[in-house]
Regions:
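Terminal helix-turn-helix DNA-binding modules in bacterial transcription factors
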Residues: 226-234, 238-246, 262-304, 323-330
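Conserved phosphate-binding and hydrolysis motifs of nucleotide-dependent enzymes
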Residues: 265, 299, 311, 315-318
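N-terminal low-complexity or simple alpha-helical regulatory segments
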Residues: 1-76
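Short hydrophobic/aromatic patch on the recognition helix
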Residues: 256, 260, 305-306, 310
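Conserved mid-sequence domains
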Residues: 235, 252-255
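Glycine- and acidic-residue-biased ligand/ion/polar-headgroup-sensing regions
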Residues: 75-95, 133
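Short hydrophobic beta-strand segments that form the core of ligand-binding sensory/regulatory domains
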Residues: 59-61, 80-82, 125-132
Length: 330
């Protein structure tokens, strides 16, 4: 049995341990705690609301490829419910395989010893709910019983043998998660509590569908996809054939495309086009370089084609986009 002090402080310890990680800062306020990520490769925030002793909900906003984790937190094992609002999140499973949480996916798991959380698309928004079950049952057992919420049964049903359950939320679950998400900017403790209890009731009383059985990738497959992405984006002026990259890693072109789509959620051509356009947008906003030069920098020798692709993504021509950013920065 864990000591009472450890039980009382599990969520506190997670936050305090995270505060020791480079680039992560903990800010406390009367009604919440926020972890802020500020690194050269991006920013993010996780805002934590304690709803009951032993039950904490966090809203996650990330614009970065990685959120580092404290090694100390791997020793703490809260029950977790994750829900992806947008973006993609990489999950390392206990058997060493990887799976990707995408929009409207949810998972129920125990904390795993991940050294960092990976967001392949560099953008992620979601909800994470932490359960310190011994403390929650000790402090709110009668309340949970009055609502017929048997959380040990929930844990056993979804995480038997320490497995991770992942699936797409059905319409009823999605509706509850979205009600919670709409409170992310203007939280109401009462409504957060009510909707979280509603979520637990639904999870306990719905028919549990078989978890996803596809979309699992080995460490090698994930590494091949990530290295391919690095090669493709290192110099956007270059147009490197996918076949050439596949040969470099001794896999078929089809396999490489499948690994890539599994990790990034897009085919290679769509992903690379967005990378090119996002870099062009950055150069238009942050520099005074001529548009023709920027076009070549991101791999378009034909400025007209560049302008058409750019407008399709951003709704403005490159010149209009630059002017709008100049007005914003005045």
């Amino acid at each position: 049995m864990k000591g009472a002090k450890q039980l009382r402080n599990m969520i506190y310890n997670i936050l305090e341990n995270s505060d020791t990680v480079s680039g992560v800062t903990l800010k406390n306020s009367p009604n919440s705690s926020t972890l802020l990520l500020d690194r050269t490769d991006g920013k993010g925030r996780m805002t934590f609301h304690t709803l009951f002793p032993g039950l904490t909900l966090a809203f996650i906003f990330v614009n970065a490829p990685v959120w580092p984790e404290s090694d100390e937190n791997s020793n703490l094992k809260p029950l977790l419910i994750n829900y992806c609002v947008s973006g993609r999140s990489e999950l390392l499973l206990d058997d060493g395989s990887y799976i990707y949480l995408k929009e409207n996916d949810f998972c129920v798991s125990e904390q795993t010893a991940q050294k960092e959380y990976i967001f392949p698309t560099r953008q992620y928004q979601g909800i994470k709910i932490y359960f310190d079950l011994p403390l929650l049952l000790q402090s709110c057992g009668e309340l949970l019983k009055s609502f017929s919420l048997d959380l040990p049964t929930l844990e056993k049903s979804y995480c038997g043998n320490h497995k991770t359950y992942i699936n797409e939320a059905d319409s009823e679950l999605e509706n509850i998660f979205q009600k919670l998400w709409r409170l992310s900017e203007r939280p109401s403790a009462f409504h957060l509590q009510i909707y979280t209890l509603e979520l637990l009731h639904r999870l306990l009383n719905m028919e549990i569908r078989p978890p996803k059985t596809c979309g699992f990738y080995t460490e090698t497959q994930v590494e091949i996809a990530k290295r391919a992405a690095q090669i493709l984006s290192d110099d956007l002026r270059q147009h490197i054939p996918v076949r050439q990259i596949a040969e470099r890693f001794s896999v078929s072109e089809t396999s490489l495309k499948n690994y890539f789509r599994g990790v990034y959620g897009q085919n290679i051509s769509t992903w690379l086009r967005e990378i090119r356009m996002n870099e062009a947008a950055r150069l238009l906003s942050d520099t005074k370089r001529p548009i023709a030069e920027i076009s070549e920098q991101v791999g378009y020798s034909n400025q007209g084609k560049f302008a058409a692709v750019f407008k399709k993504q951003f709704g403005l021509s490159p010149l209009e986009y630059r002017r709008s950013k100049n007005l914003e920065n005045r």
